[in-house]
Design a protein with these regions (language model features):
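Structural alpha/beta surface segment adjacent to cysteine/selenocysteine redox centers
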Residues: 1-75, 161
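C-terminal cap of thioredoxin/glutaredoxin-like
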Residues: 59, 63, 67-164
């Protein structure tokens, strides 16, 4: 991915009409705004920000994840932009100077590389993806699919024998 990102249409990366309509419907039903910008950002800086926040604690990590998601899909902002990401970090009270240093030092590159290698090993070819026990679910899935996978995961020999 080039640092400036790329066009989804030009590189045939856009969602299918069916998937896009499903995502829009789910967002509408949940009361969430959903923009689908053509620009696909290089998200390395955003992922680094997320890892910085993970190390700062669960509460900050969750808040940062939500703010990044809202910036992209709620407001259509470029997650490859340092200014956008520093604005997100500042709005959450995060240490923007240390985050800038983390980017410059490539502090979380090894960790992000390990996540990427694990995803490739598991066969993740697209996002979103969820690994539920030994079942890999790739792509946007209805709630019931995830619920059913969790149900299968929760079956133990004892519960199978008792019928629970």
């Amino acid at each position: 991915m080039p640092p400036e990102g790329l066009s989804a249409k030009e590189h045939e990366l856009a969602h299918s009409e069916r998937v896009e309509e499903y995502l829009r419907r789910v967002a509408r039903e949940g009361g969430f705004p959903l923009l689908m910008p053509d620009h696909v950002p290089n998200t390395h800086l955003a992922l680094t920000l997320g890892e910085w926040a993970r190390d700062a604690g669960e509460e900050r990590h969750v808040a940062t994840h939500r703010a990044i998601f809202d910036a992209r899909y709620g407001r259509g902002l470029d997650l490859g932009s340092r200014q956008v990401l520093l604005g997100i970090a500042a709005s959450l009270g995060l240490d923007t100077q240390d985050i800038s240093r983390a980017w410059d030092e490539r502090r979380f590159d090894e960790r992000l590389g390990q996540f990427r290698h694990l995803a490739l090993y598991l066969g993740v070819a697209a996002t979103p993806a969820a690994l539920v026990c030994n079942e890999l679910l790739i792509g946007s899935r209805p709630y019931q699919v995830l619920s059913d996978a969790l149900g299968r995961c929760m079956v133990t020999p004892a519960s199978a024998e008792s019928g629970d």
